[in-house]
Each structure stands twice: as C-alpha cells, then as structure tokens.
C-alpha cells in the first residue's frame, strides 16, 4: 500500500489495483489539488474544502454518507459523527485505515467500539473546526492506532510542530508512506508526517 498526502484532509491511498482519494478540496483552500484519478472517493462532509469529487478523474465511486460499502477489493464503513461528519474505516490488503474527517470532539464509546484500533489513523490537528494538538493526544490514546498521520492543517510547520511537541515525538516529513501488513507488527504507536504532494 502507498499513501500520499495531498493537503488539508486529502490523501491518495493506493492498494494493489485500486486508488482511493479522501476529502478532495477546491482552490478556495489556498492551493490546488494535484491532478489525480481514483476508483473510490470518500467525502467526510459537504464543504468545498472536503467534497470536490468533480476534480477527481476516472469516474470514481463517490461515498458521502454513513453505511457499508464493498467496491472491488476495498471495504469502506462510514460512521456518522457530530458536525454532520462521517468517519471512514477503509480496509485494503489486510490493513485497516481510519479517516476522522472534521472531528471536533471526544469520541463516544459506541463509536470507539466500531473504530476498534485501526492500523493507520488520519487525524485533524489544527483546532479550526476540529480537535487541536492537545486534545489530539486523548483521541489517539482512545483509538490506539499503530500509525498516526496528522492532517487538516495549512501551515506545514507550525501546527505539526505543536502536534509533535504535544506527543513528545520527533518525525521527519517523508514524501510517501509505503507499507504492508507485516510492517505493522510492533508495540506502541508511530507518528508519520507526510509532505504535501503538489503535483
């Protein structure tokens, strides 16, 4: 599996044959979404910074509501949350990913039980309509992922530094994450910061 960060809350997740794009955004955000195509697009909520599936090529299957979906070899489970937000659990190649969308509150037990310790967690960190760097710690401890990837920030330096400082970890930004299920056999959690892909 290969994961690129496209900026804001958008990621490109490539499994063996399928490509998933999360929360494609419009130019209103201050930078452009790279030219991309996909098989599946997930939209956490209906806002131009998150729902511009029309900018994704390839005639993807667009998911913008809670529910269970099976597309090709990908399993997607959308969980409703506050702020008309959908949390997505995506399973591919035996790896379970959780995209929290615009989460801005602590999770309830029922939701935590559904999320159930994913391998990779995409979590918002900027505190603008979402949880901030300090509240992030509690949410991460609740969810117990193997890998944490921050998202939903515009200044690539400041918010990430606050986030890493709050967690008391160091992480050098990398262009992409390449991972397989056997790479996830370790204790504790790891933070991965991805550089925004501009092309």
Tell me what each language-model feature is.
Residues 27-68, 113-122:
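Active-site metal-binding motif and surrounding structural segment of the metallo-beta-lactamase
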Residues 24-26, 45-46, 81, 100-104, ...:
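Active-site metal-binding loops of divalent metal-dependent hydrolases
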Residues 52-97:
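Portal/gating segments that form or line small-molecule/metal binding sites
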Residues 82-143:
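Active-site-proximal loop/helix segments of hydrolase catalytic cores
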Residues 1-29, 84-101, 120:
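Conserved beta-strand hairpin/beta-sheet module of binuclear metal-dependent hydrolase folds
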């Amino acid at each position: 599996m290969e994961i690129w960060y496209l900026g804001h809350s958008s990621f490109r997740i490539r499994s063996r044959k399928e490509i998933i794009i999360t929360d494609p955004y419009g130019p209103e955000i201050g930078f452009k979404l790279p030219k991309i195509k996909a098989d599946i697009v997930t939209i956490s909520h209906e806002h131009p910074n998150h729902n511009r599936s029309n900018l994704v090529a390839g005639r993807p299957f667009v998911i913008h509501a809670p529910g269970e979906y099976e597309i090709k070899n990908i399993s997607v489970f959308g969980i409703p949350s506050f702020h008309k937000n959908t949390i997505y659990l995506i399973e591919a190649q035996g790896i379970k990913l959780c995209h929290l969308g615009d989460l801005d509150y602590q999770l309830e037990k029922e939701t935590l039980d559904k999320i159930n310790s994913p391998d990779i967690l995409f979590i918002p960190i900027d505190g603008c309509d979402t949880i901030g760097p300090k509240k992030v710690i509690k949410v991460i401890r609740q969810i117990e992922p193997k890998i944490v990837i921050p998202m939903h920030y515009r200044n690539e330096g400041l918010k990430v530094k606050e986030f890493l400082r709050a967690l008391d970890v160091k992480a050098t930004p990398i262009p992409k994450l390449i991972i397989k299920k056997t790479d996830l056999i370790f204790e504790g959690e790891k933070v991965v910061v991805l550089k925004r892909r501009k092309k």
